[in-house]
Structures are given as C-alpha cells and as structure tokens.
Design a protein with these regions (language model features):
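Polar/charged heptad-repeat coiled-coil helices used as signal-transmission/dimerization stalks
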Residues: 1-183
C-alpha cells in the first residue's frame, strides 16, 4: 500500500465471517512484514560486518527471501576470505600472493583486482630493493634502483641509491688513502 503507515491492522471485532476475514488478512500481511523486517535486521548486521547471523528460514515460495540472503552472505564471506588471505600474506611479507578476482563480479571484482595491483607493486618494488641490497652485499657498488616509484617506495629507492653512492665514495677514499701509505 502506498500510505506511510504499514503497521495499521484491520479491526477484527466484526461479527462472523467478516471478523475471520479481517484476522486472516492481518495474519498474512503481518507475517510477510515480520519476515521482511527480520531479513532487513540481518542485512543491517551484514552491512555492519557481522556475518555470523543467518536469515530466518521461510516456508514455501517465501523461501526466496532467505535464499537471497544466504547468497548475499556467501558472497560477503567469499570476498572477506580473499581480503584476509591477501592481508595475512602481506603481513607475513609474501607479496607474491594474489586474490582470485575471476570469482567475483562488479565492485567485488574491482576490489580484488586493486588489492592484487597493490600486492604486485609492493612485490616488484621490494624485489628491486632486495636485488640492490644483494648486489651491495656482493661488493657491486655500481648497482642502482631505477624506475618509476611512488610514496615510500620512491623514498626507499632514493635512500638506497644515496647509500650506494656514499659507500662508493667511502670505498674510493679508503682506496686513495691506502694507496698513499708507504711502507
């Protein structure tokens, strides 16, 4: 009904069949409204991040409501699992992990693709820093980090390259000093 008040009940105090009809209509309408309200309560919990609740099981053709709620919950649990997997991998320093974006559609797919991009950028940039540090450890002071980096990765590149330049200068000074020593 188009009115603003959906809680109005038909008076049931009519005599005979009219009272029974009013009671039957009220029962049907309010069973549906109660089911919808219960589903909305669960949906609000899902929106707040609480995925522990299940929608009320409904009989017959009304089962479509809890089936839709179950599908929404399954989708939210699946995206949550992917995010937890990537977050755990990143916290453990394993940026080679990727989420399965093809399992999702629309914004969920975009979310996983963006997380995968973040993991890929971190993996590549940290990998380059690791290669530079390995080269320095092996005595190669010609190695540098080159490329487009942003934010903390740009600072790491610049700091690493400055460190190599400083080490090169120090080693050069030591070599010059050692060459001037006569025995």
């Amino acid at each position: 009904h188009a009115g603003p008040d959906i809680s109005h009940r038909i008076p049931e105090d009519f005599p005979g069949v009219y009272g029974e009809l009013a009671q039957g209509i009220n029962t049907v309408i309010f069973e549906h409204l109660d089911s919808i309200r219960a589903a909305i309560d669960v949906l609000n919990q899902y929106a707040a991040g609480n995925l522990t609740l299940d929608a009320q099981r409904l009989p017959g053709t009304r089962a479509f409501l809890h089936e839709a709620m179950d599908a929404a919950k399954a989708s939210l649990l699946a995206i949550n699992t992917q995010i937890q997997h990537l977050a755990s991998a990143a916290a453990a320093g394993d940026f080679s992990q990727r989420g399965d974006a093809d399992r999702f559609d629309h914004d969920f797919k975009v979310m996983i693709e963006q997380l995968n991009s973040m993991m890929q950028v971190a993996d590549g940039n940290l990998g380059q820093l690791s290669q530079l540090l390995q080269a320095i450890a092996e005595g190669d002071l010609t190695a540098r980090m080159d490329g487009q980096f942003h934010g903390v990765f740009a600072r790491m590149r610049d700091d690493a390259n400055t460190t190599v330049a400083q080490l090169t200068q120090i080693v050069g000074q030591i070599q010059a000093s050692a060459g001037s020593i006569t025995l």
